Amino acid sequence: MITKRIIPCLDVRDGRVVKGVNFADLHDVSSPVELAEYYSRAGADELVFYDITASAEGRALFTDILTETARRVFIPLTVGGGINSLADFDRVLKCGADKVSVNSGAIRRPALVGEAARRYGDQCVVLSVDVKRVGGAFRVFARGGRDDTGLEAIEWIRRCVGEGAGEVVVNSIDTDGVKRGFDLEMLDAVCRAVSVPVIASGGAGCIDDFLTLFRAQPRVDAGLAASIFHFGEVRIDDLKDAMARAGIPVRIVAAAQAERSETCSTSTN
């Protein structure tokens, strides 16, 4: 049985991890390299790095941070932000990324998805979609959630998967940072439309939100979150223990268990 993945998301601006609500009101959190190392030890299955202002500012994605992170962690890295060409794919992959996430770049030039899939393989191409309800419809937003593209989200996702995207990260702007649970209705629509792995993003506030996600939408492959992990509201090992007890298939990392045991031992001495 395929295990469900737990993926911390590191939104990076000016070399620091930040987090806000509804894609706005951003606050400084930590060093991305140090935070990535922590999550690697804590049992995260993968990491997602987004340079959240690269597209809006029309500049290249951070590569120095990525290179240093790839040297220190040994779990898969997905990296996005400012990906507009095959040259951007090349640069990010050479710096140590395992997968490349494309969002606004695909909206500007949809052929990029197919070109990248043919060159690197569809397993390397992750479609990231920022979705918000507008007039009852799911609409695609670009430039870090700033611009309404007018694209209908489910059709856009179906189109890009048809071009070769091997995985989809669905970012709910409506629930981002709100901590009231994932957007199950939207995720259901996406899972019905495509057969590639779907990663749910936006809305996690507690362990029960992940349990509800995987029970209600068993076709969702992974849950992605930021602030609840960054601020210690949910520990990844505690989350995975709860998932295992609930019968949800999950990878338990021995290193994370050992670190927790050592912490507990220290606290009782």
Q: How would you name each of these model-derived features?
A:
Residues 11, 39, 47, 79, ...:
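Conserved, mostly hydrophobic/aromatic
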Residues 46-64, 104, 169-181:
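Glycine-rich, proline-tolerant flexible connector loops at the mouths of alpha/beta enzymes
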